[in-house]
């Protein structure tokens, strides 16, 4: 296993204890999951009138461009404004793709990049999209290849290497805006991605870059490698049916719980895209998106209006409701790997994309969540610890003029009205989750 260069700072903290300001955030692996935990059942919705009123006051004249849903651990819908209206979620889409990957692959899963020898003696390089694969890893692959011939004292023959990579048509979701593809956040999604296919901006041709650097490193070491491009297996199952191969060298990524943090805490688009593809076993983004939708359905979530177009949220064709996201958060809180999921998120006032938000307020250290931002879209969803237990909160705005202000006000309202002051048991309402 290679030494990873990720610096992700995962911390699993009891939800009742906020993180102290300025405290170090070391890597702590959550304990093994309990077994046979029950799936959540969304109970008939019960509204908290005081919270519902506060939400509408907070939103004011902007209510029509917002969707807000607040659930408690019983599945009661304590507050809901346009919660069933599908909206563009931006990076809140990562909450879906990371939940899917964690459920399907488990917290110890690692992405692998391998140099393989086929039964006929030929060599091939394949990968799974490790976002941390770097130049040092490439150098180790070159050394391993040269040991098979083409290096000083080994053989005068040039090493023939098949590099299996996705066709260019699969490098970007087709609906990603061309302007985004030039930036690091819009880098192409490939199986063999040195430095996540970004050097300042996006690398426009990652295969050509890999070929150039591999051959140059071999030449620097006195050897020669000739690279030929090959198609990867269509799916994981196809790869498993291939003839037995010998692993000559392998580089592995950080474990899943660290990859989740890279996607959710730091909002790394490349990682989220890779996780969705690996979870589905399909590197065609359209097929992987359909598999993600099926998984959401299998969780028993309210998915009316759901449309998955990518794994990161950069696509403007994604659609999801705040009710779906809040229900997913509740579902994952009951999941055997819930600790890993929550530990992957940013913390208000402390870490990740929330490090500079709500610092020194009642929300500091008490809200773990995921933010989302693309032009005209702001979203924030996550777990808010209150005196009455956790609240699963999702907010999505498409066209808000002052989203940051309203998101903070809404979170404070949820904190203030937990427990609901009007009654111990909130009144029933008709638009219940089913």
PLM regions with names:
Residues 22-86, 107-108, 144-155:
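Beta-lactamase-like hydrolase cores
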Residues 103-120, 226-232, 338-342:
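Short, well-structured active-site flanking segments
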Residues 78-80, 276-434:
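Small-residue-rich helix-loop
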Residues 1-4:
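Positively charged n-region of N-terminal signal peptides that target proteins for export
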Residues 155, 198-340, 344:
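A small/polar active-site loop signature that marks catalytic segments
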Residues 113-220, 252-291:
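Active-site-adjacent helix/loop patches that line small-molecule binding or acyl-intermediate pockets
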Residues 13-20:
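C-terminal segment of classical bacterial N-terminal signal peptides
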Residues 75, 89-107, 192, 213-214, ...:
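Active-site SXXK
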